[in-house]
């Protein structure tokens, strides 16, 4: 089997394609949530906390010296990232909960079909019925 053919079979399996689609959608979803947090949630939270811009929150560890920039601990950006994570984790939790609920629904139970009798069994049944008469 050629390398290309093996790779094509691997790539076209359902699980690999599903995973690739999930990664692409997840990346896009992450960008949407980051925008939601950075452009909507954090400004509102900043207004509620007295006009604080979370992007600018930092602690200066070492002052700037000449052309060397200051060393800062940017905890405001960290707070934004934590909000991103919480929203994404909550959305994933809701999706997994919905999928588990769908999986838990009881599958339809197939009633067993009556076994098909072989030719010998059919003949023996007919003979038995004739002898009963």
Swiss-Prot record:
SUPFAM superfamilies: Gated mechanosensitive channel. It is found in: Cell inner membrane. It comes from the Bacteria. Keywords: Cell inner membrane, Cell membrane, Ion channel, Ion transport, Membrane, Transmembrane, Transmembrane helix, Transport. The keyword S-adenosyl-L-methionine does not apply. Gene3D superfamilies: Large-conductance mechanosensitive channel, MscL, domain 1. One of its GO terms (cellular component) is plasma membrane. It is a multi-pass membrane protein. One of its GO terms (molecular function) is mechanosensitive monoatomic ion channel activity. The chain crosses the membrane at residues 10-30, 76-96. It holds the Pfam family MscL. The keyword Transmembrane helix applies. PANTHER family: LARGE-CONDUCTANCE MECHANOSENSITIVE CHANNEL (PTHR30266:SF2), MECHANOSENSITIVE CHANNEL MSCL (PTHR30266). Homopentamer. Channel that opens in response to stretch forces in the membrane lipid bilayer. May participate in the regulation of osmotic pressure changes within the cell. NCBIfam families: mscL, PRK00567.1-4. HAMAP family: MscL. Belongs to the MscL family. This is Large-conductance mechanosensitive channel. It comes from Pasteurella multocida (strain Pm70).
């Amino acid at each position: 089997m050629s390398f290309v053919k093996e790779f094509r079979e691997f790539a076209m399996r359902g699980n690999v394609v599903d995973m690739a689609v999930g990664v692409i959608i997840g990346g896009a979803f992450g960008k949407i949530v980051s925008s939601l947090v950075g452009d909507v949630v954090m400004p509102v939270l900043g207004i509620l906390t007295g006009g604080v811009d979370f992007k600018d929150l930092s602690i200066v560890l070492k002052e700037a010296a000449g052309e060397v920039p200051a060393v800062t601990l940017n905890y405001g950006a960290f707070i934004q990232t934590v909000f991103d994570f919480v929203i994404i984790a909550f959305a994933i939790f809701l999706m997994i909960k919905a999928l588990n609920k769908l999986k838990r629904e009881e599958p339809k139970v197939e009633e067993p079909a009556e076994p098909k009798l072989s030719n010998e069994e059919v003949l023996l049944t007919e003979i038995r019925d004739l002898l009963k008469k």
